[in-house]
């Protein structure tokens, strides 16, 4: 597949009854998502796969859904939980692709070239690059012409104590 989108996260609002929240990007496995619920007070809680939610359509280019668990009345239902895990009113759900930084494609000398495996490895690297870019986009940066050569603060922790970061 070609990677034609840079979307790596989706968000939605809870209402206490909605249990399905879509994600619109490819993942390779159910565990390739971070699901975070932010309360109205700003507290963020990372939810656990198979405890708080399940995932649909891993491996599908167009994405799928995160399904929060709740008491469906049938313990054989994949969405069943004895306690309600659905996001409540005032809570925001963030679904973000988060791949392990590993490379599992192994090429064996003199074997036929596995084009599909190669393309999957390239897609995975592109996805990881997109995740890094998303993190960079949320960070403080200095201008390209700045002459700072170290990423560390020049003042000691003692000198920085009780100080405030400010902007003009």
Question: What is the meaning of each model-derived region?
Answer:
Residues 1-122, 131, 135, 149-166:
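N-terminal assembly/attachment segments of tailed bacteriophage virion structural proteins
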Residues 139-150:
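Extracellular/luminal recognition modules and glycoprotein regions
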């Amino acid at each position: 597949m070609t990677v034609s989108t840079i979307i790596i996260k989706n968000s939605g609002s809870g209402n206490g009854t909605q249990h399905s929240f879509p994600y619109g990007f490819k993942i390779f496995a159910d565990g390739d998502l971070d699901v975070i619920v932010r309360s109205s007070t700003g507290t963020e809680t990372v939810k656990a796969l198979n405890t708080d939610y399940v995932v649909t359509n891993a491996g599908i280019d167009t994405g799928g859904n995160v399904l929060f668990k709740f008491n469906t009345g049938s313990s054989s239902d994949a969405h069943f939980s004895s306690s309600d895990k659905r996001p409540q009113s005032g809570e925001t759900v963030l679904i973000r692709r988060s791949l392990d930084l590993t490379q599992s494609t192994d090429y064996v000398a003199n074997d036929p070239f596995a084009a599909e495996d190669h393309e999957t490895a390239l897609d995975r690297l592109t996805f990881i690059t997109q995740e890094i870019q998303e993190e960079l986009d949320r960070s403080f940066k200095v201008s390209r012409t700045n002459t700072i050569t170290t990423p560390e603060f020049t003042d000691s922790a003692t000198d920085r104590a009780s100080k405030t970061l400010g902007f003009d």
